[in-house]
């Protein structure tokens, strides 16, 4: 191979590499995850494990903060000890009613209910976290996790997070035996919940610079 061919081959490889980098940068990025919370879950007396959820605090800050604070229980009430009271295969699992446990209760950190923040995000895939409601502007504490894409809920329910780890546990819950009103025969309970340190918050602790 002569020098000219080597030279052309080098620039061909370089051009392909740059094109791939550019294509990767051009890929649409998902919503920014600003907080991570966890649920440790039991079915009956059997531990299922931990589900880690990422919250979209840039896109829907009010909704994300409500869920985060209910996960930590820092307001004196929250998700710990509550159940997944409604489970529908090939649709979703629903929880968050920590006052009545049957889908008629719950409350937000802002009062009993708060308004729909926005509908920027859609129910495009499994593992998305969205607010359950009883109609327009009736968000409280109840939520659901999708197990399939649910586009018919777009514009009606606020998507505010996603499952980061432990989706296999969501799938197990989806398949538990159910009785009347899609309620699990054996209780599916959040035995512990809280917040995990996110990369953003860890970085803030190590830096004195203000974010622009």
Swiss-Prot record:
It comes from Aspergillus niger. Residues 38-195 form the PPIase cyclophilin-type domain. Residues 192-212 have a biased composition (Basic and acidic residues). This is Peptidyl-prolyl cis-trans isomerase B. Residues 181-212 are annotated as: Disordered. The gene is cypB. GO terms for molecular function: cyclosporin A binding; peptidyl-prolyl cis-trans isomerase activity. The lineage of its organism: Eukaryota, Fungi, Dikarya, Ascomycota, Pezizomycotina. Its EC number is 5.2.1.8. It catalyses: [protein]-peptidylproline (omega=180) = [protein]-peptidylproline (omega=0). One of its GO terms (biological process) is protein folding.
């Amino acid at each position: 191979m002569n020098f000219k061919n080597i030279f052309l081959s080098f620039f061909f490889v370089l051009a392909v590499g740059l094109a791939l980098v550019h294509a990767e940068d051009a890929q649409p990025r998902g919503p920014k995850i600003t907080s991570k919370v966890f649920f440790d879950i039991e079915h009956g007396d059997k531990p299922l494990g931990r589900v880690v959820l990422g919250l979209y605090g840039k896109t829907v800050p009010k909704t994300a903060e409500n869920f985060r604070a209910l996960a930590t229980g820092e307001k004196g009430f929250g998700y710990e000890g509550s159940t997944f009271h409604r489970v529908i295969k090939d649709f979703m699992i629903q929880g968050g009613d920590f006052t009545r446990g049957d889908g008629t209760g719950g409350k937000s950190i802002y009062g009993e209910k708060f308004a729909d923040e926005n509908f920027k995000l859609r129910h495009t895939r499994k593992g998305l976290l969205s607010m359950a409601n009883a109609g327009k502007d009736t968000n409280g504490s109840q939520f659901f996790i999708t197990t399939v894409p649910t586009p018919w809920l777009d514009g009606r329910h606020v998507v505010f997070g996603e499952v980061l780890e432990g989706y296999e546990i969501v799938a197990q819950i989806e398949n538990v035996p159910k009785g009347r009103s899609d309620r699990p025969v054996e209780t599916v309970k959040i035995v512990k919940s809280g917040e995990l340190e996110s990369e953003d918050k860890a970085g803030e602790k190590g830096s004195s610079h203000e974010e622009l």
